[in-house]
Amino acid sequence: MKASGTCSESCLDGLFYYTRFVDYNATLIGRSSLSLLTAAQLAELQRIDSPTIANAIEQFDVRGRVEGFAGWELRCAFPELGTTVGYAVTCTADSTTPARRDRGLMRLWEAVERAPKPAVIVIKDIGQDRSRSCHMGEVMATTAKALGAVGCLSDGGLRDVNEVRALGGFQYFCPGFVVSHGNPVICEVDVEVTLNGLTVGPGDLLHGDVNGVLVIPSSIADRVAAQAMKVREAEAKVLAFVRQPGLTAAALKEFQDSFTH
């Protein structure tokens, strides 16, 4: 199920007597991320930087090379936390339309509680002024962490940067920060969303660091870490060669020819 791009009819009326919600397990049926990794496998992925993971995924040829990752607009707020790995809990939200009443937030918390752990909350802004939107601050981040989330990914604004940094272990990925929360409303929960070119569905495995965020296809998730090690080994050979004194283009070509055959 994809997000409609707007709130449901009752949401538009400001009533919020109905918020689209699908049982988490039912949403995952048929999705690639139904098979979950072990804690050890997740820890192994967390020790690897996201660009290396991206390079490893390319080796499996399971998607196009310009698919599966977010653009530069979604920035890592706390690079000192290292790599964030978790399963997506998705929703749409609007904080810039006046006079709305929110009855969807508890639905989100219920979805986070039921989701595979660690979880990453993914919030798609569908309001009328995304540059002034705000979808999470200290209270929501603290609640999310208590329920097993390790971060929030949003194409809208977030806030309370210092307080959320002080939580430790909770990452923000967003375009920027906003001082006021406006009129925050959760519209739909457990829907497929697209943020800055990255399409995310409920249960998708996310991997992100200071370089950005991507989705690891479940069909290869248990093999990506091992492939990433091979990528690192190959890159180490290239780096060792080009760091030698007196490098020439001719020598580089000869090396590359031998390296690729």
At which residue positions do the language-model features occur?
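Ala/Thr-enriched low-complexity intrinsically disordered regions
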Residues: 3-6, 19
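Feature captures the catalytic cores and cofactor-binding loops of soluble hydro-lyases/lyases
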Residues: 21-202, 216-261
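Channel- or pocket-lining gating/hinge segments that regulate access to a cavity or pore
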Residues: 211-214
